[in-house]
Amino acid sequence: EVVSGYTAFIIGIRSIVPEAVMTVQYTNIWEDYYLEKVCAEQLIDEGCVVISQHSDTTGPAVACEETDSSRPVYYISYNDSMADIAPTTYLTGTKINWEPYIEQAVAAVLKKKNIEDCINGNIHGNDVSAGFEQDWIQMLALNEFTAAEGSRECIDTLVQKFKRKQLQVFCGEYTGTDIND
């Protein structure tokens, strides 16, 4: 989940800024406010201008918001809007909508069927994934204060393309079997 998440993130960024590079800091834990904030601060000190996370606290958003205003840095959240935590740096984010999966998984169990046989998604062994087209992924609110002009229209267009299966994230040169590929 983490590797596919940050791979999708850099692919999206490079669709707008092809020369963008990404530095990843691992915390090796889902929830550690201090460690997440320190990692974000280190990335900001190294010159990163967009910070995101695949962890569960407000630490990275707070680090962005506390950055000296002479150094532009923006924050994109994961699973929760951070607009109230980082009102001058938060751009937008995505979240996982667990409702479709839970409903289908419970229905499978009640019917005494394998969950994988009853899920409307992409099955990978015992794992399953889906996107905007099945409403498993949703956009969080766009911060109109920090977002560039035209961001709303661009996001809406891309989400519609995903829903119509006119756009795929994982195609092209990004393939591998481990994080070092």
Tell me what each language-model feature is.
Residues 1-181:
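A residue-level marker of the well-folded mature domains of exported/periplasmic proteins
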